[in-house]
UniProtKB/Swiss-Prot annotation:
GO terms for biological process: glycine decarboxylation via glycine cleavage system; nucleoside metabolic process. Gene3D superfamilies: Aspartate Aminotransferase, domain 1, Type I PLP-dependent aspartate aminotransferase-like (Major domain). HAMAP family: GcvPA. Disulfide bonds: none annotated. This is Probable glycine dehydrogenase (decarboxylating) subunit 1. It comes from Legionella pneumophila (strain Lens).
Amino acid sequence: MPYIPHTPNDTKEMLAAIGAQDIQDLFDEIPASLQYAGFQNIPAGINEMEMLKEAQNQAQKNRNGICFIGAGCYEHHIPAAVWDIASRGEFLTAYTPYQAEASQGTLQLLYEYQTMICELTGMEVSNASMYDGATALAEAVLMAVRLNKHSKTNRVLIAGTVHPFYRETIETIVRNQHIEVITLPFDEQQGITDLGSLNQYTGEDITALVIAQPNFFGCLEQVDKMTSWAHHNKTISVACINPTSLALLKPPGSWGEHGVDIVCGEGQPLGSPMASGGPYFGFLSTRMAHVRQMPGRIIGRTVDKDGKTGFSLTLQAREQHIRRAKATSNICTNQGLLVTAATIYMSLLGPEGLSQVATQCHQNTHELITALTQIEGVEQAFKASFFHEALIKLNQPVQSVLQQLADAGIAGGYAPEQHYPQLANTLLVCATEVRTAEDIAKYAKTLKAIMSKRGA
């Protein structure tokens, strides 16, 4: 194979130059008990054809199970054209060009992305993306604190139904910024925020309210009432949403009497594969009145001196180009490649295609829950309506059930007990548009056998 850097003679000369007998001498300071002996069994180098065959043999060992896990990362069908286009050399770059205006194609794509996000969320302006959904929400909280000039306490109410990892990220980022985070309890019968717990803060100095839709349990919150409460209480409202759901649900810009102030979320469902947690991208949009406090880059459309349309970075005085203490955020880049894929994904599907995806997700999950709750020992945990994932309760230890499902080639869901101790032996399950009737039937049949085995 070409490009192997060191020949045996090269290695011999370098070892002689430093007075070593062999490469192992370079690691002689590491005790033998701490050295892994298995590397000695690695064979000598092979040619490209042999290597490809070995890689194929290893790949055949992978288990491609049926996935019913959601909890923030979702398996959706990605049209082949999405990554075929996104991988073109014009788009697949290491970083945003420092002379950004030289890359008009990239800037136009980001501008189109911003337009699509605004159409989805019902807001007026979007940035060019954030790191992921969790950091987008944390930045939205910081933005809300900057925006609320009436508040003197910097207290932020966060629904307990917001993704627990997102809440942990917020706590980490605001910990030393004199911001108090208050978690609202949820109704353990309905699976949504207890409005009574929210109403007890009426008239108090609350800086921001964070609402998830759908929430971590897949349930649909009473977003109109929560948003209107925030408006009447002079509180900045922040919506953390799943973009797929917006093809069916009311956009946050229309919640309540006046809509929310900031919308953010995880962009992974828009054309990014599940990949061990990333890379993904976060999106953030807001009202034009708040644009100077919005973190991240913004692409604007303008006209040059010859009257030709052009695209450029705009409102840079609120970003990292100014003194660090004056900038809106320490985040100074965007997830351009993932945004490219998302823009292509949304363009290829269009409004009708996105609606079909959301509808199929909704129907599949309802069919899944119907099938699973017919099994003795399985019941739906919450009564509230849900979008494309829901919580079921088992009368057996959930980890044992998950292991047996895995042995049968089924990733059965996510157990939220580590975040919510009161939800012992529950399972968060999801069925997107890629799950078939056969997949759902196999899950139900396998789970029924597992549950009946315990009862026998």
